[in-house]
């Protein structure tokens, strides 16, 4: 919905006729634009700056109006680099907010914040566009059914199950495996549920975005021969983009997901990697707009910005959006305002632990810190609930005994505590799992473990039936039958060595 600027003389009458303004000031990615009296654009309108820089290169920068300053001026945030812009350049008011393509034609393609394809595979064949700013669905449209979303990952399905149509946070510091877990979830959901996913890469590494794209092509999640058979649309606003693009790219991805939910009536998965970068970009924009910073230097509008994004992610009577959001935790501090504000919106949290990653237990999901509102007997059933609680109790007891073991050694424990420690160590290892997307690193084929199989495995460990097996037999296996088979192989190998 863009209006190309017409060439015009600098006369005021022509400017008024074409709804054109001129750049009055440039502060990095923020532009002040002067418009003729009575021709002021609305907040969130898209403005387009077209022209040539000093070297003759074409410039095409889209901005979004953020503030009306008075004196016929507006302050706008650029969605791409402002290099080459000069004061006095013409700016066109499109009279509409940013709009992006939506629908089946977006599948298998990579877009930027403006909805322009950036994968060099030609234009997107769609005439359907949707504005990125919308209200959340009304109460009457919401669906309140509670059901579990099976992921095929043991530690998640057993201890912190995801809600269909819910919001899930992946918490963890740098380098503990958030992005690998997200890639595995996209892979499992496309294969096991046949669902459509939208991936929003918000302020993360371009290399990771490229790796994810290649991985998806290899695994068949994206079909280059026939895009209609692809299962995912990708929207990237990576680390090298200006803060305006990083702040709005989450809304672009969400708008595409909403169309699949509301018009196609599908169940959609929305991945946001990383929601912290959305907050960080908002903080940068807030400072550039001259707002007073709030706690720890964050923007004063942090809760409002987060709420306007999160409240649109929900289940309606037409379909659902289940959202999985990676949350970078600065300095591993969960009380930082960015992760703390995110917590308020989540139905489940998957917390990744550096301690488990150091032990080599992947996925490094902390079984005691991860939570879910779904883990209730009336939702998951008595058997699942009881097994999950007993697993947590065993691991908690092991955690309490670790100081005693470190000082006095295992031999000083009672018989009962020694048994608890042995079972807890088996459980800890059985919570690890080989991933499909990590096959190249681990050399082990990936495993999808159904919920019933997961519960059966942990019940067998807790019952004591497998006390005789070595704990390494439970490391990086799928279901419990693979663990017993691995134990037999280990025994044969040790006999051969003798």
Curated annotation (Swiss-Prot):
Belongs to the ATPase alpha/beta chains family. SUPFAM superfamilies: C-terminal domain of alpha and beta subunits of F1 ATP synthase, N-terminal domain of alpha and beta subunits of F1 ATP synthase, P-loop containing nucleoside triphosphate hydrolases. InterPro entries: AAA+_ATPase, ATP-synt_VA_C, ATP_synth_F1_bsu, ATPase_a/bsu_AS, ATPase_alpha/beta_chains, ATPase_F1/V1/A1_a/bsu_N, ATPase_F1/V1/A1_a/bsu_N_sf, ATPase_F1/V1/A1_a/bsu_nucl-bd. Produces ATP from ADP in the presence of a proton gradient across the membrane. The catalytic sites are hosted primarily by the beta subunits. ATP binds at residues 172-179. Pfam families: ATP-synt_ab, ATP-synt_ab_N, ATP-synt_VA_C. It is a peripheral membrane protein. Transmembrane segments: none annotated. This is ATP synthase subunit beta, chloroplastic. It comes from Cucumis sativus (Cucumber). The keyword Ion transport applies. The sequence shown corresponds to that of chilling-susceptible cv. Gy14. GO terms for molecular function: ATP binding; ATP hydrolysis activity; proton-transporting ATP synthase activity, rotational mechanism. Changing residue 86 to R: In strain: cv. Chipper and cv. Baekmibaekdadagi. The keyword Ion transport applies. It catalyses: ATP + H2O + 4 H(+)(in) = ADP + phosphate + 5 H(+)(out). Its EC number is 7.1.2.2. It is found in: Plastid, Chloroplast thylakoid membrane. The gene is atpB.
